[in-house]
Curated annotation (Swiss-Prot):
Gene3D superfamilies: Rhodopsin 7-helix transmembrane proteins. It holds the Pfam family 7tm_1. Interacts with the host Gi complex without activating it, thereby probably interfering with the chemokine-Gi signaling. May also function as a G protein sink to sequester G protein from the cell surface via internalization. Plays an important role in spread of HCMV via the extracellular route. The gene is US27. Belongs to the G-protein coupled receptor 1 family. It comes from Human cytomegalovirus (strain AD169). Residues 1-34, 91-104, 168-193, 258-274 are virion surface. Residues 341-362 are annotated as: Disordered. Keywords: G-protein coupled receptor, Glycoprotein, Host cell membrane, Host membrane, Host-virus interaction, Inhibition of host chemokines by virus, Membrane, Receptor, Transducer, Transmembrane, Transmembrane helix, Viral immunoevasion, Virion. It is a multi-pass membrane protein. Residues 59-67, 127-148, 214-233, 299-362 are intravirion. One of its GO terms (cellular component) is membrane. This is G-protein coupled receptor homolog US27. SUPFAM superfamilies: Family A G protein-coupled receptor-like (SSF81321).
Length: 362
């Protein structure tokens, strides 16, 4: 009786603890939405690659720890954006062997990038907090070498935290089913859901809300308003994270309560599965549009990304200047350089903060 109950629990939980789109219905849905998925993949890939290229190419000399965290956050979003359509296309063309690969691959991409992105967001908020509140006192501690070390640690931590979600699952009966022992099949799925709720949602939001509140109070009381734009960008990033991941985490929380209470209702189960799929879709949309938030809100980021885009566009398209116009072009270039030098001197003279304080987030 215990074995059958555990098997029933495992069957009921298989859809819940699998938080990526792996069921047969999703493969069929991909047939109808393939164009939209690939369009979002192209847009998300372009925006995330543009962010990464801007940080590595345009800002390589004045890169800050915040830029390092944003770059790796874009890498995590890029893995989610690229992973979904390619895994589903592979499943379409190799139906016999690919379901196992898709089951493990999608779970690995989803959870590793989830935990890594959370770590980078937390460090981004803490870095902004240190810059605004502590300022020069932490310049020796706050450097790119330490940020790179933290990035490596966070990626390793994300792989370890996501390991149960892709190593303990296999494709069985058209579903990505968790292979748990009979002794752990009742409580281990609840543990996984709770871990995602706390480590992947509640704790990061609480920490980022605390640091944001402290930064706002410090700026209002002690600093000028020129730092507020950094907080605007950070606030939009945090709010988008909380909004887009809320349905997914709510479904996990409801499923944990359902398992602990021992309630097995088909209607409730279908509602939770639907919420999980909606949450997964919103997470995918957020990974595609997250760089757009930087472009729309961050003035400095928008300028740097636009400059990078123009540089690479000019490299791809050769502009030939007629021989008789070379002197004119040289004179125009000298005038532009002189004008830029005067403007830079004026900006530095009247800047409210040092030029080294200017961050990619602004």
């Amino acid at each position: 009786m215990t074995t059958s109950t555990n098997n029933q629990t495992l069957t009921q939980v298989s859809n819940m603890t699998n938080h990526t789109l792996n069921s047969t219905e999703i493969y069929q849905l991909f047939e109808y939405t393939r164009l939209g998925v690939w369009l979002m993949c192209i847009v998300g890939t372009f925006l995330n690659v543009l962010v990464i290229t801007t940080i590595l190419y345009y800002r390589r000399k004045k890169k800050s720890p915040s830029d390092t965290y944003i770059c790796n956050l874009a890498v995590a979003d890029l893995l989610i954006v690229v992973g979904l359509p390619f895994f589903l296309e592979y499943a379409k063309h190799h139906p016999k062997l690919s379901r196992e690969v898709v089951c493990s691959g999608l779970n690995a991409c989803f959870y590793i990038c989830l935990f890594a992105g959370v770590c980078f967001l937390i460090n981004l908020s803490m870095d902004r907090y240190c810059v605004i509140v502590w300022g020069v006192e932490l310049n020796r501690v706050r450097n790119n070498k330490r940020a790179t070390c933290w990035v490596v640690i966070f990626w390793i931590l994300a792989v370890l935290m996501g390991m149960p979600h892709y190593l303990m699952y296999s494709h069985t009966n058209n579903e990505c089913v968790g292979e748990f022992a009979n002794e752990t099949s009742g409580w281990f799925p609840v543990f996984l859901n709770t871990k995602v709720n706390i480590c992947g949602y509640l704790a990061p939001i609480a920490l980022m809300a605390y640091t944001y509140n402290r930064m706002v109070r410090f700026i209002i009381n002690y600093v000028g308003k020129w730092h507020m734009q950094t907080l605007h960008v950070l606030l939009v990033v945090v709010v988008s994270f909380a909004s887009f991941w809320f349905p997914f985490n709510l479904a996990l929380f409801l499923e944990s309560i359902r398992l602990l209470a021992g309630v097995y209702n088909d209607t409730l189960q279908n509602v939770i599965i639907f919420c999980l799929y909606v949450g997964q879709f919103l997470a995918y949309v957020r990974a595609c549009l997250n760089p757009g938030i930087y472009i729309l809100v961050g003035t400095q980021m928008r300028k740097d990304m636009w400059t990078t885009l123009r540089v690479f566009a000019c490299c791809c398209v050769k502009q030939e200047i007629p021989y008789q116009d070379i002197d004119i072009e040289l004179q125009k270039d000298i005038q532009r350089r002189a004008k830029h030098t005067k403007r830079t001197h004026y900006d530095r003279k009247n800047a409210p903060m040092e030029s080294g304080e200017e961050e990619f987030l602004l």
